[in-house]
């Protein structure tokens, strides 16, 4: 490690979520500019539901790394916005399945374009090779630290 030097402030900025926070702020701003009233957190839930509709809140927690109270709050807000509905599982009445509404489904194309555009803005000036290395480093950090 002695010969390896790194920018400790940059490392902790990444690990503390500052990069993620900056991208989320930009994404939220870009959504609002296009008239889409969702947060980046809500978008990650929609993303999971666009991939597989009708999943449990626990599945959404696992997919988004959110705790149960945070997920409940997010889904409550998304129900008020008519983006999702909770329906009791026919096999297990104690479990609610979360489904997209028509409004939630209609956001997929436009919001995905905005997310891709935001990501392109964030990655401006970064080569494909740098991206591959960065992804691999972050993947290893995640693997080393996940519970």
Please state what every model-predicted region is:
Residues 76-136:
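Charged, amphipathic alpha-helical coiled-coil/dimerization segments
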Residues 21, 25-70:
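N-terminal helix-turn-helix DNA-binding core of bacterial DNA-binding proteins
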Residues 1-5, 128-147:
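C-terminal regulatory/oligomerization modules of transcriptional regulators
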Residues 19, 23-26, 30, 64, ...:
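Alpha-helical linker/hinge and terminal dimerization helices associated
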Residues 1-34:
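N-terminal leader segment of winged-helix/HTH proteins
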Residues 8, 41-42, 103:
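N-terminal positioning helix adjacent to the helix-turn-helix/winged-helix DNA-binding module
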């Amino acid at each position: 490690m002695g010969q390896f030097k790194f920018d400790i402030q940059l490392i902790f900025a990444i690990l503390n979520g500052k990069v993620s926070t900056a991208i989320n702020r930009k994404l939220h701003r870009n959504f609002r500019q296009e008239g889409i009233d969702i947060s980046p957190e809500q978008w990650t839930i929609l993303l999971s539901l666009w991939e597989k509709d009708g999943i449990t809140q626990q599945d959404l927690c696992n997919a988004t790394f959110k705790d149960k109270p945070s997920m409940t709050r997010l889904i409550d807000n998304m129900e008020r916005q008519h983006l999702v509905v909770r329906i009791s599982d026919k096999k297990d009445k104690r479990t609610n399945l979360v489904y997209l509404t028509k409004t939630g489904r209609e956001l997929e194309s436009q919001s995905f374009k905005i997310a891709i555009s935001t990501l392109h803005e964030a990655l401006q000036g970064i080569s494909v090779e740098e991206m591959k290395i960065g992804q691999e480093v972050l993947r290893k950090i995640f693997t080393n630290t996940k519970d």
